[in-house]
Curated annotation (Swiss-Prot):
Molecular functions (GO terms): tryptophan synthase activity
Listed cofactors: pyridoxal 5'-phosphate
Keyword Lyase in record: yes
Organism from which the protein derives: Staphylococcus aureus (strain NCTC 8325 / PS 47)
Species lineage: Bacteria, Bacillati, Bacillota, Bacilli, Bacillales
Residues spanning the signal sequence: none
Protein name from the UniProt record: Tryptophan synthase beta chain
UniProt keyword list: Amino-acid biosynthesis, Aromatic amino acid biosynthesis, Lyase, Pyridoxal phosphate, Tryptophan biosynthesis
HAMAP family: Trp_synth_beta
Amino acid sequence: MNKQIQTEADELGFFGEYGGQYVPETLMPAIIELKKAYKEAKADPEFQRELEYYLSEYVGRATPLTYAASYTESLGGAKIYLKREDLNHTGAHKINNALGQALLAKRMGKKKLVAETGAGQHGVASATVAALFDMELVVFMGSEDIKRQQLNVFRMELLGAKVVAVEDGQGTLSDAVNKALQYWVSHVDDTHYLLGSALGPDPFPTIVRDFQSVIGKEIKSQILKKEGRLPDAIVACIGGGSNAIGTFYPFIKDDVALYGVEAAGQGDDTDKHALAIGKGSPGVLHGTKMYLIQDEDGQVQLAHSISAGLDYPGIGPEHSYYHDIGRVTFENASDTQAMNALINFTKHEGIIPAIESAHALSYVERLAPTMSKEDIIVVTISGRGDKDMETIRQYMVERGLAND
């Protein structure tokens, strides 16, 4: 394994050629303040203790690493372990980062939070920690996503957040990020931008990765306890990339194959997909340089996925770098492949995963049979499927797999 891998951003915030701080001058003071505050918090044992306290007592960590016996047997290859991020409070990995950033905001004396959300999971996690720490929260959410995720919108409002519909563009996650950044610029004195994925201007990709790395750290100690060795392969789905970077990061220098699974939407031969790595090229969006779905003129294209959490047109800078150096292999799953995997997995394991996570499972179903029975795969179940029941039901009804 190549030990010459860059695992921290350089002083300008780059991983290789990706990352940086492509923001208006007006935001630079806030970015500098955040970077300094985070550096201090990271080195402060008291901050880390407080974070650990809430992760354990409030979120319910550590999450189990569950051996999927029936699923493993059905695929007839490698042993499959599930990292159960679906069992966190609020039902997904998003809370790991929301909690960490809320504690950081509190430490910085910021009383208000602004966030963006796609599937609504990050919005719910942000609203949850805002309620916990008595902070105000404004959430920007694309109007299209609001339609798809009504239950999560109500959850956020019940928790005390103000949800603002974004009509611009295609009314999805990318447009919500634009609005959240604009809002932050004009409220920077008393507001922290609680960014939900491993992207945005430096230091956000590092902050989000660090708070999500608890996933990979737990996997490492849990698999060593259960199997006495590291896994052969680790699989996670990728939108912006926070659950994946949190899963992969503690294994970057180990001899473990890492697979990120992007959303191929209606297929990689169509223009309705979210393949930032698969079909994208480097460009700048939302304050950072990363792989993007864009046309020849550099116009960012609309991303598509049946999963509201994966239809983002970019993929964080650290993933972009790991792709270029060949450390992480990027695969994909179409809407249909993901939904079929979701149905199959649920019937075998009695766990309904989020559609996002089902993209990772779809690749596991292709990978496991090619490996030996002694091999070990860990797949991150990034969230539970409650929020997706309507989409799943519709999909099954349309195909005659369920009654209307």
